[in-house]
Amino acid sequence: MPDMKLFAGNATPELAQRIADRLYISLGDATVSRFSDGEVAVQINENVRGSDVFIIQSTCAPTNDNLMELVVMIDAMRRASAGRITAVIPYFGYARQDRRVRSARVPITAKVVADFLSNVGVDRVLTIDLHAEQIQGFFDVPVDNIFGTPVLLEDMHARGLEDPVVVSPDLGGVVRARATAKALGDIDIAIVDKRRPRANVSEVMNLIGDVEGRDCVIVDDMIDTGGTLCKAAEALKERGAKRVFAYATHAVFSGNAAKNIKNSVLDQVIVTDSITLSKEMAATGKVTQLTLSGMLAEAIRRISNEESISAMFN
């Protein structure tokens, strides 16, 4: 069996260290810095010839910097004769442009990034909760898209929810809401119907379902500015919801997210460490962060040992 080695870029160093601790190994020795003109500089400081290399790097903000770090690290590993290179991308950026709508003159950036990673020499990709599952098909290498739901469900079960109802923040999230509701004992779901006049601005229009006197659990794959989420929570409280919790795998938290969430009627927002939480978000007092390290460590172990990934969720 090839020697397994873990390396990390600068996007999520804390998560990378937690994964290494779970696997009882040390992070590999690599210097990831910048040249004086801002270009990415990578130096691998140990032998990786023939090794089973895993590079842990979310492509979150600053998205372009983190993506280039990942790409340059993959190239460095390939040129150093690594046996196999797996890109572990807890949060896969550029995933929201995955199709052209009505032949609009726009790029499909998810495909661009997939080609970028494939062409530079990655052998496999491990990620969590892709914004659109069909993005896996953009790659010419195997992709393991695992689910962060078990980590979130564990917190839901421990939270002592009273007469809970799972809420989808939009019509597109109904499948996720139904799956969560089933995992919580086949409980009720509700749907917030919204209209989005422009990017990152949303308006709640209608609520489908009964939430009066009940704890509401809003589920989504990511939270960006929090505009949709906060307006959904407001609509739920106006309809008599007792408490409103929001669960999401990816804490993008861009723009006015901290202000929006701090001033909202949300009781708590629960996210994972696929993206490092900023000090500003932590200071809101409304955000709880769970770790994906155990799940990712197990997935990495299984990939290295040629074991089934899907068996993790059976």
Curated annotation (Swiss-Prot):
It comes from Vibrio vulnificus (strain YJ016). Mg(2+) 1 binds at H131. Its EC number is 2.7.6.1. Keywords: ATP-binding, Cytoplasm, Kinase, Magnesium, Metal-binding, Nucleotide biosynthesis, Nucleotide-binding, Transferase. GO terms for biological process: 5-phosphoribose 1-diphosphate biosynthetic process; purine nucleotide biosynthetic process; ribonucleoside monophosphate biosynthetic process. SMART domains: Pribosyltran_N. D-ribose 5-phosphate binds at R196, D220, D224, T225, G226, G227, T228. It is an enzyme of class 2 (transferase). The keyword Cell membrane does not apply. Mg(2+) 2 binds at D170. This is Ribose-phosphate pyrophosphokinase. ATP binds at D37, G38, E39, R96, Q97.
